[in-house]
Structures are given as structure tokens and as C-alpha cells.
Amino acid sequence: MPSKGKDKKKGKSKGKDTKKLIKTDESVVDRAKANASLWEARLEVTELSRIKYRDTSRILAKSNEDLKKKQCKMEKDIMSVLSYLKKQDQEKDNMIEKLKQQLNETKEKAQEEKDKLEQKYTRQINELEGQFHQKAKEIGMIHTELKAVRQFQKRKIQVERELDDLKENLRNTERIHQETLRRLESRFFEEKHRLEQEAEKKIIMLAERAHHEAIVQLNDAGRNVFKENDYLQKALAYHLKETDALQKNSQKLQESHTLLLHQKEINDLLVKEKIMQLVQQRSQIQTLQKKVVNLETALSYMTKEFESEVLKLQQHAMIENQAGQVEIDKLQHLLQMKDREMNRVKKLAKNILDERTEVERFFLDALHQVKQQILISRKHYKQIAQAAFNLKMRAACTGRTEYPKIRTFDGREHSTNSVNQDLLEAEKWTHIEGNVDIGDLTWEQKEKVLRLLFAKMNGCPSRKYNQSSRPPVPDYVVSDSGETKEFGDESKLQDKIFITQQIAISDSSGEVVLPTIPKEPQESDTGTF
């Protein structure tokens, strides 16, 4: 019997649990429906705000497109004005260059009358340069104004960029705000769900405990009252939670509404500022256009005046050029006469030089012959002196005589007894009086005589020869060893004695003609010396 009572109690408790589960499922469904209706209302509100923002963005895009079209038109007009002004400047520069070229040509043609005409042309050129500087200043003013327009355009672009940056910042802030809201909402719902689960678990635990205690203590009527009280408490807690959530959502919506109103006010202010700036820009562009028109009229008037002055100057220059051309023809005729006279003088000078070159060749051949004789005689003297020295040394070796003084034959500088000292004695003019026959002189003295004759014939001052110096020998003379030797600077200076090697004659064609003198003198008969 007690086992049957226990089974009945267990069946009753299971039925009660199923009823409670059904009730909790119904409450969850009701909550889900309430949440769905709430989110639908939110979605409708956001859709309405999105439609409004779309309309405003379309209106702003249209206004931006209109402003861009106007800006492009204004830029095209400004570029056309700039190109027209640049073309006019280029044409003026070309005209100025042509006039300068014409002036240079007139100066080249009239070289001799340059001093007379220079004063007139300088005055006229100064006047033209003054006008040109004035025009350049005016053009510079135009350029400065155009630069101001360009700076204004650049400033406009910068302001537009700043607007775009502000819009992007606003969008970023909105996006960040929405993300933070989403995060907070997700956290809130997670915490809410977790707390609800914990509360439900605790309530279930408490309810089970209370239920068991109530079942034990109360009768049927008390049990019904307890159940109703429990149900009412749950409903009240649920409604309180819903009211808290609705209050929080209403606060968030109010905050977002205030933010949107603030952004709208900022956008309205920015649009008003841009409209004011566009109005100012239009007024400035109109004033600049008026200035450009006035400057164009002034430039056209000044160009006409400049062209008329240029025509007058060209006519005056043509008349003066014709007069100068007549005088140039006369001078050219005189120059031709002078050229003929110069050609005659050149022919005479050439004939004289040809005759002189023959004499110089004769002297060169004589000098060459004398130098060769000097070399031969010196070589022969060295051989005889060396043979005599060798004989004395042999005799001294046998003991018949004493040893002679040491003598050198290679011409060393520090030698005290050299053969070259005997050779230098031949150059000295000792024991020679007036009316000397040239056949009685040595070969070295004959060479000096020939050089003095050359110097006197060419009008050059006679040079003093150092008696201790080596006798001059030309570069082409062969020494004892069969090799060519270069002797000092006198062999180079002797080539500068001759007049035919110093004077260059130019004929009428402008080419330089030098007399042909051979470097190596030809052998001639020098029997007279």
C-alpha cells in the first residue's frame, strides 16, 4: 500500500511539471512575438529615415553636379581667354623679334654710317622699349590677376576637399557609433539572456522548494492561492523587465535623434557657407571678366598704335637704307681700287722676296759648307793630337822621356787640359789687324763673319759670342760617331735671322703665302771664301 501511494504522488508531480513547461513555452512565444513587433517598428522607423536621407543626398548630388558643370564652363572660358592672350603675346614677341632682326640687318649694311644713325635709332628704340615695358607691365598685371583667379580656384578645390573630409568624418563617426551601439546591444542581450537563464533556474529551484513545502504544509485552497500568487509575481517581473528595456530603447532613440538633428544643422550650415562662397566667386569672376574685356580693348588699341609706329619706322629705315646703300656702293668701288693697288704692291714684294731668298740660300749653303769644314778640321786636329799624345806616352813608357800631362779628348766640363780648349782658341780674334784677307782666317772666324753679314743685311743687331761656348753647328750635321747632334740655341736662333722666314705675305684672296726656303741648304761652290 505505501508503494502504491508513492506511485500516485509521483504521477501527480510529473503532470504538474508538464503543465509548468507548457506555460513557460507559451511565455517564451509571447516574448518572441513582442520582440518581433518591436523590431518591426524599429525597422519601419529606420526605413523612413533612410528614405529621407536618400532624398536629401540626391538633391545634394544634383546641386553638386550643377555646380561642377558651372565650374567646368568657367574654367573653359578662362582657358580660352588665357590662350587668346598667350597667342597675342606670342604674335607681339614675333613682331618684336622681326623688328630686331631688321634693325640688325640695317646695322650690318650701314657699318660706316652707324655713328650718325645710331643716335636716331637709339631714341626710337628707347621709345619703343618704353612702350614695350608698359605693355609688359600691363601683361604682367593680367598675369597676376589670372594667378589670383587660379589661386581662387585652388582655394575652392581645397574647400571642397575639406567638405568631403568632413563628410567622411561624419560617416566614420556614424559608423563607429552604430558599431558601438550594436556591440552594446549584443552585450546587453547576452547579459540579459544569461541573467534570465540564471533567474529562471533560481526561480525554478525556489519554486520547486516552495512547491514541495507548500504541498507538505497547505491544503488544496492554499495551494491554488500560492500558484496564482507565483504566476502573478512572474508576470509582474516580466512586465517590469519589458518596461526597463522599452525605456532604454527610447533613451537610445532620443540620443540618436539628437545626433541626427545636430548633423543636419551642421550640413545646413555647410551648404549655406558653400552657397555664399559660390555667390562671391561668381561676383569675382564677373569683375575679372570685365577687367579682361577692358584689358583686351586696351591691348588692341595699343597694338594698332604699335603697328602704325612700326610701319613709320620701317619706311624711314628703308629710305635711310637706300641712301646708305648708295654710299656703300661708292665705298665698295673704292675698296676694289685699293685691292688692286694692294695686289700690285704684293706682287712687287713677292718678286723682291724671291730675289732675296736666292741670296739667303747662297749664304745658307756657305754656312753649311763652313760648318762641315769646321767639323772636318776639328776631327783631324783631334786625331793628330791624340796620335802625338800616344807617341809621348809610348816614349815615356820606354823611359826615354818624361810622362806628359794628362789630356782629355771627350770634351768633359771639369777637364783642365782638353783638346776642346785648343779648338776654342781658333775662335779668338788675336793678332789680327785691318785689311785682312778672308783666306787667312780660321773656319770658326769665317762662320762669325758670315753671321755678322747676315745680321747687317737683315738689319738685326750683332750678337756677342761667348768665347768659351761651343761653336754652333746645325742640327743636320753628322758628328764623328755618325749620329745627329743638337747644338745649343744658336742653331735655332740662326733660322730666325732671315727675313723671308719672318714675314708672311697675303695675296688678294686672303690666303697666307710663305716663301719656300729649304730646311737643308743645297751644296754650292764656296771657293771664294
From Swiss-Prot:
PANTHER family reported for this sequence: BASAL BODY-ORIENTATION FACTOR 1 (PTHR14845:SF5), COILED-COIL DOMAIN-CONTAINING 166 (PTHR14845)
Protein location: Cytoplasm, Cytoskeleton, Cilium basal body; Cytoplasm, Cytoskeleton, Flagellum axoneme
Any one of the GO CC terms: ciliary basal body
Summary of the function given for this chain in its UniProt record: Plays an essential role in sperm motility and male fertility by stabilizing the sperm flagellar axonemal structure. May be required for the stability of ODF2 and MANS1 proteins. Dispensable for the assembly and function of motile cilia.
Pfam families for the chain: DUF4515
Keyword Iron set for record: no
GO biological process: flagellated sperm motility; motile cilium assembly; negative regulation of microtubule depolymerization; protein stabilization; single fertilization; sperm axoneme assembly
Primary localisation category: cytoplasm
Positions in coiled-coil regions: 85-201, 271-361
Organism for this UniProt entry: Homo sapiens
Biased composition (Basic residues): 1-13
Protein name in the entry: Basal body-orientation factor 1
Keyword vocabulary terms for this entry: Cell projection, Cilium, Coiled coil, Cytoplasm, Cytoskeleton, Flagellum
